[in-house]
Design a protein with these regions (language model features):
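A short, internal acetyl-CoA/4′-phosphopantetheine-binding micro-motif in the GNAT/acyltransferase core
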Residues: 36-39, 162-169, 197
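Conserved active-site alpha-helix within GNAT-family acetyltransferase domains
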Residues: 67-73, 175, 198-216
Length: 235
């Protein structure tokens, strides 16, 4: 199984309070994340997306197939993407780590932005942490690793923003933090899932050890609007 059109589904179900809408396109508020969803990747969908992005604005989307060039859009970056689901695995117990795991919140947002800018786990904005439960590890008071929740659809929550400062790799921080986030998800009776670049073999190996299995192969694309359109209409 896989979660079909998961960004669109999230913005039409459990995360409507973060949504901005224009016809058959949805996006998260810009300070939350740049992720956007289309009912269908057709002319109407991209017209709605242009409405949301605004002139020169960017949008990050998930697609079943590689992005095909369209008028009014500049392709910025993209890559093959995997969706992985953990229907079983180690979400109910913490992986071994000597580090103390701390819950993160509003006051930690500047450091979270700094860490994600260094490690590039995916789109992360000043309000991304509002999407769910975020945890981190500090070394000498500095945030060096983190993980949290992002997309939410009925019965499922995504583990996201899993990242570790390069100076602290190999200490088991990612697995420990993911396991804590997965524990919280399972305590709510939900199933963890995630997305990862298909070429990130180091991360995929960690996720497989935690019990995640591949559910979908697709693509992500970051696009920049070159059209002149109206402003988005809030949901």
């Amino acid at each position: 199984m896989h979660l079909k059109n998961v960004i669109w589904q999230a913005l039409n179900t459990r995360q409507t309070h973060f949504a901005e809408c224009c016809d058959t396109a949805r996006r998260f508020m810009s300070e939350v994340t740049s992720l956007c969803g289309l009912a269908e990747p057709n002319d109407d969908g991209y017209a709605g997306l242009a409405c949301l992005a605004g002139p020169g604005g960017t949008a990050a989307i998930f697609l079943d197939r590689p992005y095909a060039r369209r008028a009014g859009w500049e392709y910025v970056v993209g890559a093959p993407l995997l969706q992985m689901i953990c229907e079983n695995g180690h979400g109910s117990r913490r992986m071994k780590s000597q580090a103390k795991i701390l819950e993160l919140g509003d006051k930690d947002s500047p450091e979270m932005l700094e860490l994600t800018a260094q490690t590039k786990p995916g789109p992360f904005g000043p309000r991304t942490h509002e999407l769910g439960y975020y945890v981190g590890i500090r070394d000498n008071e500095k945030l060096v690793a983190m993980a949290g929740e992002r997309l939410k659809v009925p019965g499922f929550t995504e583990v996201s923003a899993v990242c570790t400062h390069p100076d602290h790799l190999g200490k088991g921080y990612a697995a420990a933090l993911m396991t804590e986030v997965m524990r919280a998800i399972r305590e709510r009776g939900e199933t963890p899932f995630l997305h990862v670049r298909a070429d990130n073999t180091r991360a995929i190996a960690i996720y497989e050890r935690l019990g995640f299995r591949m559910a979908w192969e697709g693509h992500f694309a970051v696009l920049r609007s070159t059209a002149v359109v109206g402003e988005a209409r809030p949901a």
